[in-house]
């Protein structure tokens, strides 16, 4: 921006021409009007000039403040050699040192006369481009005169503490503080002493008392001494059985040993022990020793829940497999007992049935803690089977197979044959409740078996053995592909045939009892399984 140049006759004229400019038009021309404000410079004329704002095409002179008189007489900006760019069309803009207007409110008249608003630029540019040190330092001294600065600043009292004479706290003698305060008499206090005096009504103590001194003075009482050792300093005063005061050491010694503490053990100083940081694992170790049974149960339930939440299929496989082994063993023993005592009375069989149902319910309730939804489904199936067993007049020999299906939670069937009838007994499986294999192979319980029931005695044994096949294959229905033996498992039809179960175990008794009946029906069941598998493949 161009600046109006003065002739340099009087200092007041140079300062008065820098007050406030009046801008007109589209910011292309700036009319600078200034009047003489001093009586000593009344002869000076008012200068009005029009110059270009950013780049002056006529004159490229950017002289500032008290330029030399020869510059004014010789022409604008001609006699000032090396001051600024001398080219007419200078591509580089050289800013002036005009400051913001609001500086005058804080830094007095000297700064206000040397301050000018730069329209079109949001920052104030200092004149650091000039090699003329005299002109630059002269303007700097006039702009930041210490007398005018301290005289006109509204923060004079605050600045006086920082740059003026030093202050000292009358209480602690501090010479530097974030905030100086005054007491009631007008003396200066540091921030800490002032706040302490304001809160407590007394001067802040200068010396912190020793911790040992505080404990000694706090526990020392006038005319109080230990009746055993005679000491007057202790961490805790106690009383003996007679009510006399004793020190902490003598009191504890008498409490532990039942005799007075010997005088030879007296020490002048108070013996203190070094405290070790408390370990968090010590309490848990003691608790584990006392309540190991409860802790192990809780840990088992917690692990069961975590596995069920993270990997429900994996946890289902682990727990259901072990559950099937125990249920199959109990079911096998009960079936052998019932078959051995087939000639027993009806009432005894019903009592045994009720007892076994109670045992199954207890096992299911324990297993339901980990799998509540699965336990509910199994409980509903047990109730349905209980209704079937109450309505049927015979077929008590099917109890073991029924309980095996209830424990596995896979299949329900209706024994509709009576002891003297020749009606057909259809074994139906609920496909909605029968899970599929984890690899996508359909469950073996989708294959329905129909055999004609009559008065033949081997149907009881065959039914028990046949449903034991299903209980063994039910392991695969849980998502675990269990291959008992390569000779007994049909991979094409997904079923077991034969009389042995290999690794599943617990079926030796049933195998020995079933024997020939299972082998007789193996061919028929195999053919029927092929037909059912073909139907399932076609529908799926």
Swiss-Prot record:
Signal peptide: none annotated. The keyword Transcription regulation applies. A zinc finger (GATA-type) spans 169-193, 226-250. It comes from the Eukaryota. GO terms for molecular function: DNA-binding transcription factor activity, RNA polymerase II-specific; protein heterodimerization activity; RNA polymerase II cis-regulatory region sequence-specific DNA binding; RNA polymerase II-specific DNA-binding transcription factor binding; zinc ion binding. Residues 446-456 have a biased composition (Basic residues). Interacts with OSA. This is GATA-binding factor A. It comes from Drosophila melanogaster (Fruit fly). The lineage of its organism: Eukaryota, Metazoa, Ecdysozoa, Arthropoda, Hexapoda.
């Amino acid at each position: 921006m161009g600046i109006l140049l003065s002739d340099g006759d009087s200092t007041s004229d140079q300062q008065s021409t820098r007050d406030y400019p009046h801008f007109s038009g589209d910011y292309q021309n700036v009319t600078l009007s200034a009047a003489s404000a001093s009586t000593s410079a009344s002869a000076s004329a008012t200068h009005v000039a029009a110059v270009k704002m950013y780049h002056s095409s006529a004159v490229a002179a950017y002289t500032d403040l008290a330029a030399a008189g020869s510059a004014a007489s010789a022409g604008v900006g001609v006699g000032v050699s090396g001051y600024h760019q001398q080219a007419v069309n200078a591509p580089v803009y050289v800013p002036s040192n005009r400051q913001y207007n609001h500086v005058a409110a804080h830094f007095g008249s000297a700064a206000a006369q040397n301050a000018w608003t730069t329209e079109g630029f949001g920052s104030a540019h200092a004149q650091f481009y000039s090699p003329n040190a005299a002109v630059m330092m002269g303007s700097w001294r006039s702009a930041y005169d210490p007398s005018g600065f301290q005289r006109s600043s509204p923060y004079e009292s605050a600045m006086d503490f920082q740059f003026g004479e030093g202050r000292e706290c009358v209480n602690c003698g501090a010479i530097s503080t974030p905030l100086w305060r005054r007491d009631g008499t007008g003396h200066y206090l540091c921030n800490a002493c002032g706040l302490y005096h304001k809160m407590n009504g007394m001067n802040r103590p200068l010396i912190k008392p020793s911790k040992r001194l505080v404990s000694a003075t706090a526990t020392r009482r006038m005319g109080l001494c230990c009746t055993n050792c005679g000491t007057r300093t202790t961490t805790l005063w106690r009383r003996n059985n007679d009510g006399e005061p004793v020190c902490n050491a003598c009191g504890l010694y008498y409490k532990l040993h039942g005799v007075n503490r010997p005088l030879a053990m007296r020490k002048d100083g108070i013996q203190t022990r070094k405290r070790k940081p408390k370990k968090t694992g010590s309490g848990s170790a003691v608790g584990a020793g006392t309540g190991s049974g409860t802790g192990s149960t809780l840990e088992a339930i917690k692990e069961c829940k975590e596995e069920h939440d993270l990997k429900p299929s994996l946890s289902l496989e682990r727990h259901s497999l072990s559950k099937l082994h125990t249920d199959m063993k109990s079911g096998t023993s009960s079936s052998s007992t019932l078959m051995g005592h087939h000639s027993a009375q009806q009432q005894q069989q019903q009592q045994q049935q009720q007892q076994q149902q109670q045992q199954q319910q207890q096992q299911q309730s324990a297993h339901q803690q980990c799998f509540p939804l699965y336990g509910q489904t199994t409980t509903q199936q047990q109730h349905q089977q209980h209704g079937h067993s109450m309505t049927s007049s015979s077929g008590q020999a099917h109890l073991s197979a029924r309980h095996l299906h209830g424990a596995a939670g896979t299949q329900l069937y209706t024994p509709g044959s009576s002891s003297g009838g020749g009606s057909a007994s259809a074994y139906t499986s609920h496909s909605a409740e029968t899970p599929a294999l984890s690899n996508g192979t359909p469950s073996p319980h989708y294959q329905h078996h129909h055999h004609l029931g009559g008065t033949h005695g081997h149907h009881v044994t065959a039914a028990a053995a046949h449903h034991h096949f299903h209980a063994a294959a039910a392991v695969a229905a849980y998502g675990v592909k269990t291959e008992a033996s390569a000779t007994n498992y049909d991979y094409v039809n997904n079923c077991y045939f034969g009389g042995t179960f290999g690794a599943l175990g617990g079926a030796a008794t049933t195998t020995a009892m079933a024997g020939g009946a299972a082998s007789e029906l193996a061919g028929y069941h195999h053919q029927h399984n092929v037909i059912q598998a073909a139907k399932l493949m076609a529908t799926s």
